[in-house]
């Protein structure tokens, strides 16, 4: 459910792309681990985004413009991520969603930022990612330090004294 909400937020954010009058479809990039260590997550992201794109287009698109989902496989590696990000920039997407894994996301951040493209990470928790201060980078999950703080607070609230991971 959390993953789906993140994807919903990402697609909604991509509506920023619709502030201009487009004759062509609005291109939204999905950079996801279709292969590699996180393939199951990436394949789920792909299915969700394809379904949402279909539903958006059936409802008339965004401001009357059809949405085109452009998919690139980041292979779950930073090197592949840089290539995938460059391909999405070349495809002229207005936003890139779905980057999963902090190292993969970080490898693509500068590429998207320099191109002026909004990037929405859906499974990237490293503090470094937002510490850079990139104005077009967003994420749908909490940072590592926030997860620890909330976990500690929740465990204390329920009176747990010892935990095991």
Where are these regions (language model features)?
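Extracytoplasmic ligand/sensor domains, especially the bilobed periplasmic-binding protein
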Residues: 90-165
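Short, well-structured alpha-helical segments in soluble
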Residues: 70-71, 75-94, 153-157
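Cleavable N-terminal signal peptides
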Residues: 10-11, 21
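Short, well-ordered beta-strand elements
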Residues: 25-33, 67-71, 161-163
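Bacterial N-terminal signal peptides that target proteins for export
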Residues: 1-9
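Extracytoplasmic "Venus flytrap"
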Residues: 29-48, 72-79, 100-103
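Sec/Tat signal peptide C-region and signal peptidase I cleavage site
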Residues: 17-23
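Signal peptide-proximal N-terminal region
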Residues: 46-69
């Amino acid at each position: 459910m959390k993953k789906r909400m993140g994807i919903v937020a990402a697609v909604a954010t991509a509506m920023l792309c619709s502030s201009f009058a487009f004759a062509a479809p609005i291109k939204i990039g999905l950079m996801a681990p279709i292969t590699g260590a996180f393939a199951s997550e990436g394949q789920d992201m792909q299915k969700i985004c394809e379904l949402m794109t279909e539903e958006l287009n059936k409802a008339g698109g965004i401001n009357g413009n059809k949405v085109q989902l452009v998919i690139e496989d980041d292979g779950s590696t930073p090197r592949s991520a840089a290539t995938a990000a460059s391909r999405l920039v070349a495809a002229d997407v207005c936003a890139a969603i779905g980057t999963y894994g902090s190292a993969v996301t970080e490898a693509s951040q500068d590429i998207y930022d320099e191109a002026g493209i909004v990037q929405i990470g859906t499974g990237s928790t490293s503090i470094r990612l937002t510490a850079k201060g990139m104005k077009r980078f967003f994420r749908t999950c909490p940072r590592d330090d926030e997860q620890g703080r909330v976990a500690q607070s929740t465990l204390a609230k329920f009176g747990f004294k010892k935990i095991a991971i």
